[in-house]
Amino acid sequence: MAYTTLLRCTLVAAALSAGKAFASPTTAAPQAKTTTSVDQAYRESLTYFFDRPATSMMEALPLGNGRLGMLSDGGVQHQRITLNESSMWSGSVDSTAWNAEAYKQLPAIRKLLLAGRAKEAEDLIYRTFVCGGVGSGRGQGANTPYGSYQVGGFLHLNWDKAPELSGYYRGLSLSEGVSKESLVVDGQAYRTKRLYSVLGREVQVVHLTNHSEEARRDTLRLSLSRPENGHPAAEAGFLTLSGQLPEGKGGRGMSYAIVVRPVLPQGGTLITRGDELLVVNAPTVELYIAHNTNYYDKRLPVMARSIEQTLQAKAVGEANLFAEHVQRFTAQMDRVQARFLGSDPARSSLPIQRRLIAYYEHPERDPALAALYMQLGRYLLLSSTRPGALPPNLQGIWTETIQAPWNGDYHLNINLQMNYWPAEKGALPETVGALTDWVESIVPSGERTARTFYRAKGWVTHVLGNVWQFTAPGEHPSWGATNTSAAWLCEHLYNHYRYSQDRAYLQRIYPVMQGAARFFLTTLVKDPKSGYLVNVPTTSPENSYYTPQGKAVAVAAGSTMDNQILRELFSTTREAAMALGRDRTFVDSLSTALRQLKPTTLGPDGRIMEWMEDYKEVEPHHRHVSHLYGLFPGSEITPHGTPELAEGAKKTLIARGSSSTSWSMGWKVNFHARLGDAEGAYEVLNMLLRPVDAIDPKTNKPYGSGTEPNLFSSHPPFQIDGNFGGSSGIMEMLLSSETGCIIPLPALPKAWKAGSIQGLRVIGNATCSLSWSAGELDRLVLEAHHAYRHTLLLPGEGRGYVLRLNGRPLDTKTLLHQGRLHLPQMQAGDRLEVVKKA
C-alpha cells in the first residue's frame, strides 16, 4: 500500500470519528446487575498460568470479545500473537450445491430402504442425492466455494536481545478476560505485558511496560504477516495487513484489513523500516489492534474502518479501556460463582501443565480444577460469540491456519449445538443472540434445499453449516444424509424462551420452528412394517450398522435420534403455537403426527435401540451416542419418569464405553448427570481432563483425546465443543431443571465433599444458588425474575428442610405430589429459601 493510500484511509477514518465518541456497538451484550459481591481471592482462583513460553497453539492463552480473538505465545525474544476475527472465511455462496436432479431419485431411495435394501439405497444416494459440486471438500474446503474459517494474521514482537531470566509468568484470568505476562531478570521486573480483547468494543490491546533501562534500550520490532493473501505494510505510524480471500470459484472473495497502532505515552521513538515499525527507548508501549472484514457489508471500507477504530481507542486511552473491559467482563463472569472446597492449596500454585498431570494422578486432591474448568466453558463462550456476530465454530474463534480442521465450520449433528449447552444455565443468555441470527439467516437456503431435494414445504438443513448458508446434504451419505439438524437447532431457540419467558422472542422464532416442523410433516412416510411415520432417508449420525445380509451401511429408514428430536420439535412447536394463540389446524397436524412416531424402545439386550430395528452396530464404541438424545439434551428419558428407559440408557452407556473424543466424553458427563450417576459422571469428567499426552496402557501410546496444556479440549485435534460439553456437564451434576423439575445436586460425586455454586439459571427465568457439605444439600435460594410456578425435587421429599417464600414458611406436606414439591406461583422479585433442618 502506498503512503498516500494509507494517508487517505487515515483521513477518512478521522472524518468518520470526528465528533463521535468511541461508543460501544449496539450489538454489545447487555450487562448484568451483579447482586452478589465477589472477593478478589475468588477471582484470582479463576486464573491459570504457565511458567514458560508456548511451544504451540495448544499452550497459548485464548482471549476474545465475541468477534475478535487473540492467542499469544508469550515469547521472550520473539513473540507471536495470533489474530482472529469470527467472519474471516474464504468461500462464497455455492449455487451448485442445490442438486437440481436429486428429488427425482427420492421415491426410489425410500422404496429401497423400506424394502430392507439399504445397501442399494445408500449406493443410489451417493450417486444422486448428495450436494452438487464438491461440498465441503471433505473438510479441506479452503479453496472451494464452501470455504474455511481462517487465521487473520500474526503480530510479531521481536527484540534484539534475549535476557537471561530468573523468572517467567504467563497467566489468564477467566474472571477479567486478561492475560498477563512477566519477565524477571535478577529478581527484578524486566518487562511486563497485559493483553485483552475489549468487551463491547472493536479493538484488542497489548500494553507493554519496560521496567529496566536495559529493557527500554532493547529495540522492539513490530510486524504483521500471513501465510497467503496478505499484504503487510508499515506507514504513517501504522502497521497494516490487508487482502482478499479466495471465493472458491477462481476469483477473489472477502476483503479484510488488520491495523495495529502503536502509541508511546511516556516517550520514545517510532521508526518505519520496510514493513516493520521499530520502537526505541520507550518505557511503555500500547498497541491498539483492529480487524475487519466486509462479510456483513460488502461496501465497507475495511482499512478505513480499522484505522478509525484504532484512533478511537487511542483517544479513549488504554487505562480507561482496560478499566471498562474488566468491569464488563467481570459483570458477566461473576453471574455464576463456583467454589469446590477441599483442594490441596499447593495445586493452584502449579503451572497449568503440571496441575493437569497432578489432577490426572489424584483428582480428589483438586476439586477446584473442576470448578475452574466449568468456568472456562463460560469464559470461552463469552469470548467467542456475542449478539450481532457469529456463533462459535468448531474452534470457537481461535485458529492459526489457513485450512482449519474440518474447515472450522458449523457441524450440525451435535457440535454447534453442544457449543451452546452452557449458555442458558450458565447465565450467558445473550450469547444465544448470534445463534438465533445465524439460524434465521439459513432459513431461505433451507427452504430452497427442501424444495430442490425433497419437493417439500418448510426448511431443512443437514450436517454441514458455514457462513455462506450451506444447507444441502453432505458429499457422502454415511454422514451427510442426516437431516434433523434444523429441528435440533430449533430446540436451542425454544430453550432460550423456556429460560427467559420472553414472549417477543417466542414470536420471533415461531416461524422458524413452524417451518422446520412443516418440512417433516410433509416428508415423513409410513413404514409398512410398523405403521409408524419414519424419516427416510436418514442416519444415526456417523454410525453404521450391519444389514441382515451382513452389509455395513449408514443410511436407514428412521432412527431413534430422529424420532426423539421430532417428538421434541412437534411438541415444542405445538406449545409455542398455543402460547401465541396461532394456527389451530397446524397444531392438530402436529398432534396427529406425534401419535404416529415410534416411541424410544429397548432392544432384547436391554439397551436403547439405535435404529427402528435391532441392528448390530459396526462400531460398538462409536463416539456418537445419538440414540440417547432423549436423555440429554432432550428430556424424555428420566430416572423418575421413565425408569425402564433410564436403565436402558445406563446399559447403552456401559456398552458404548467412556473414553472417546473430547466432545463425546463431554456429552457423556451430561448423560451420567441426568441419570443421577454421580461417580459415572465424575469418572468421565476426569477422562475429559486427562492430559492429551497421557499414555494409554492398552496401546502404550498417548491418548490424544482429552485436554491440551492450555485447557482446550482435544478431539484430537482441538475442538472447542468438548470444553462446552464438559462445562455443561459439571453444571448438570450440580443442578438440573430442563426435565421440568428443579433438582439440586442430582449427581454430586463423593470427591466434591463441600462447596457452593451461585447464579445458575433454571427454566422459568430464575436463578438458583446452593451450598452443600458432607455430600448433602445445606441451603438453596431460588430468585424469580418472571412469573412462573416451579417444581422442586428434594431429598426425602423435603422432610429434612425448611422452606420459606419471601420469609414466610411453606408447608411441604401440602405442596407434595408424586414425590415433588409443587411450589406456589412465584412473581418477579420473589425469593424462595430452602434450609436443611438442624
Where are these regions (language model features)?
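Aromatic-residue-lined binding/catalytic grooves and analogous aromatic/hydrophobic interfacial grooves
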Residues: 30-477, 484, 493-497, 528, ...
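Acidic/histidine-rich catalytic neighborhood
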Residues: 515, 519-576
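C-terminal catalytic domain of Rieske-type non-heme iron oxygenases
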Residues: 396, 400, 533-535, 543, ...
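Hydrophobic, well-ordered secondary-structure elements that form the walls
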Residues: 377, 513, 566, 633, ...
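Extended, hydrophobic alpha-helical segments in both membrane/secreted and soluble proteins
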Residues: 485-496, 505-522, 664, 681, ...
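Bacterial Sec-dependent N-terminal signal peptides
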Residues: 1-32
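Catalytic cores of secreted or luminal carbohydrate-active enzymes
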Residues: 141-160, 720-763, 767-768, 773
